[in-house]
Amino acid sequence: MEWSHAFDAEILLPQADARWLTRPDRAVRTWSGTLGVLPGVTLIQCGGHFPGSAVAHWADGADGEGVLLTGDTIFVTPGEDRVTFVWSAPNRLPLPERAVRTVVEAVGPYRFDRIYGGWWQPVLRTGAREVLRASADRYVQFLRGEAAVD
């Protein structure tokens, strides 16, 4: 909260996660669905390991092809050729199928060719939209025990 006051900046909190807020403050602004935060930059509440999990879409990123900034909602794999999903990374718990489908559907209307994950993760540099859909389908096949191991 101190930094938001120092820079006169809002703290944007998805309404779905407001119950986790332990220090209410005038700087906190809740939102739901989508929220334009800058020209060409939209927050998309897509769910995931928290109901309010969100990603940012930057329409002009990747030379105008679009970028998703996903944090820990969508993980780019080390080989930079797939993405994956987790409910709890520290506990190695998978994200349920319904939540995976919700994430993919939420970003569906947006154009993007690149995905930047959180932390020091690799970057999916091209074809991200197609890779996301294919990776989600493969992930669900593994959840169901239907995937061929390659």
Language-model-detected regions and their locations in the chain:
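Metallo-beta-lactamase
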Residues: 2-147
